[in-house]
């Protein structure tokens, strides 16, 4: 059901014309804004193309060491205190090739190795684009780079076993542990996040729980 939601809502939203990017931007990444809509849809579903809002190098809270944090566009939640409201709609990202993004990641491999850093896929909600995220994670692991997902966990069912096998760390953003409060804050149910957390625990994946004090 969740995977269907990603396909029916997220991908269709991606077909709209790309708007001007905000944030750090996608400097250095190829822009593919002239792709036909049908081609975008097919390539996004297979994971060779994604909608990227921006990326930046950070050393603060997105995982250990120096990180290249990639913000994907699109999110199913509507949090009252959203930190990145300009990433909510997939149409506000730019179409970016997975291979192009991996080439950019490769350029920072020595920095990641020196600082014990890596890449963090964030958003928006990274699991709105599971095929693209999975391809980037696989490519990063093949380069020996530490990987992290920054996610609400609401779309955790969309994460394949292979994707999780390629993930070293999950930054799990739990908006509230009270179902009623969670729905009030996000407009969605808490249980999918709990289920995803249980799945991560069963697989022994490192988790950093995030909780915002408002």
Task: Please name every model-derived segment.
Residues 91, 95, 123-126:
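Short gly/ser-rich anion-binding loops that grip negatively charged ligand groups
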Residues 18-21, 31-33, 44-46, 100, ...:
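Short acidic/polar alpha-helix capping motifs at helix-coil junctions
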Residues 6-7, 99, 177:
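Residue-level detector of intrinsically disordered/flexible regions characterized by low predicted structural confidence
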Residues 102, 106-214:
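Conserved AdoMet/S-adenosylmethionine-binding subsite of the radical SAM
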